Regions:
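Catalytic core of pol beta-like nucleotidyltransferases
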Residues: 2-130
């Protein structure tokens, strides 16, 4: 309760206290959201950084059902040609053909790109050591 009183924010927020051991219990539903996307209210840094990790989204995608021209166009979009590619723009990493890592903070935007281009993909949120 003392933390709630010290925080001055324009909007009301709901703060719940939990024990550290609760955070790592499987039945605590908010744990993945906190570990992957949580931001500390004390220093405005990602919670994952405090425990030595970074939150990423790993996209595995396939261009198998696309024409050659569509594949080339999409690869230019990702990697860039005459303009900066989306992987670099969104601070991502190209791991191998069909696999990209994107920081969790940019993952929704990147997911929308796959959807808008009708690309078959799967997404896994992961923590990687810093």
């Amino acid at each position: 309760q003392s933390i709630k009183k010290k925080i001055k924010l324009p909007n009301r927020i709901d703060i719940k206290g939990i024990l550290l051991e609760e955070l790592f219990q499987e039945q605590f539903f908010a744990r993945s959201g906190i570990l992957l996307e949580g931001i500390s209210i004390f220093d405005d840094k990602p919670f994952a950084h405090k425990i030595g990790f970074e939150g990423w989204a790993m996209f595995v995608y396939s261009l198998r059902n696309k024409t050659h021209a569509q594949k080339v166009k999409f690869n230019y979009l990702l990697r860039g040609r005459s303009v900066i590619g989306l992987i670099k723009k969104f601070e991502g990493k190209h791991l191998s053909p069909g696999i990209i890592l994107i920081p969790i903070k940019n993952s929704i935007i990147f997911e929308d790109i796959f959807k808008s281009h009708k690309i078959d993909y799967s997404k896994k949120n992961i923590l990687l050591e810093r």
